[in-house]
Design a protein with these regions (language model features):
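Helix-turn-helix
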Residues: 2, 6-44, 48
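Solvent-exposed, amphipathic alpha-helical segments
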Residues: 6-13, 60-64, 95, 99, ...
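Residues in soluble alpha-helical coiled-coils and helical-bundle/repeat scaffolds
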Residues: 29, 40-44, 48, 66-70, ...
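Hydrophobic alpha-helical connector segments
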Residues: 48, 59-92, 141-148
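Short, basic, alpha-helical segments at the C-terminal edge of helix-turn-helix-like DNA-binding modules
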Residues: 51-56
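Amphipathic alpha-helical packing segments from all-alpha helical-bundle domains
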Residues: 58, 88-95, 107-132, 143-146, ...
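Helix-loop "lid/cap" segments that line or gate small-molecule binding pockets
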Residues: 64, 80-87, 94-105, 178, ...
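C-terminal peripheral helix-coil segments that are non-catalytic and often amphipathic
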Residues: 84, 121-129, 151, 158-188
Length: 188
């Protein structure tokens, strides 16, 4: 537990490139051999931290979404949930995008990000399957989950780059209004 907390703190402060087992050992009060024993490598530690963070974020988002009845309700829940999480701890979003950027060139990190995103898609897909105007086919539900998550990533990146702004608030509202048409294909 202390090692995972230290790993998360170092990742948020120094990023993936700056993470070393020496830094995690110093921060956790554990030795490098213990870290190697439990996690095998830097990538093993990063994967364990990412799983913990991903599970916590997913749980918080699902609690925040509640039991929406419409796609718009799902969109409202996830966009507000991500904004709340970022307001509380912007470092989590920085960590996510840092890992995503490294996933392009590092297969181990790509596997970590793929696992995280699959978990998000599965969770959003389950919520979409329960709403009255949600996708009827599983392939459409998969596409809808990818769409919603991609939009959330863009909004989160905008918040990281420029901070909270009236334009970002309007963009979130546009997302909530447009999500039902995009997900159900209405108007296409």
């Amino acid at each position: 537990e202390r090692i995972l907390e230290a790993g998360l703190a170092v990742l948020k402060e120094d990023g993936y490139a700056g993470l070393t087992t020496s830094k995690v050992a110093a921060r956790s009060g554990q030795n490098k051999a213990l870290i190697a024993y439990h996690f095998g490598s830097k990538q093993g530690l990063v994967a364990a931290v990412a799983r913990e963070v991903s599970a916590a974020i997913t749980e918080e988002l699902l609690e925040g979404i509640g039991e929406p009845r419409t796609v718009a309700g799902v969109a409202r829940g996830v966009v507000d949930g991500v904004a709340r999480i970022m307001e509380r701890d912007e470092g989590l979003a920085r960590l996510y995008f840092d890992l995503a950027s490294h996933s392009i060139v590092e297969p181990e990190v790509r596997a970590i990000i793929a696992e995280m995103k699959q978990g998000y898609r599965d969770a959003v897909g389950l919520v979409l399957a329960r709403v009255k105007d949600g996708p009827k086919r599983s392939s459409d539900a998969d596409g809808a989950a990818v769409y919603l998550i991609a939009c959330l990533e863009g909004l989160a990146l905008e918040q990281l780059e420029r901070g909270e702004s009236p334009a970002l608030q309007r963009a979130r509202e546009m997302f909530v209004r447009s999500a039902p048409a995009a997900v159900t294909g209405v108007g296409s």
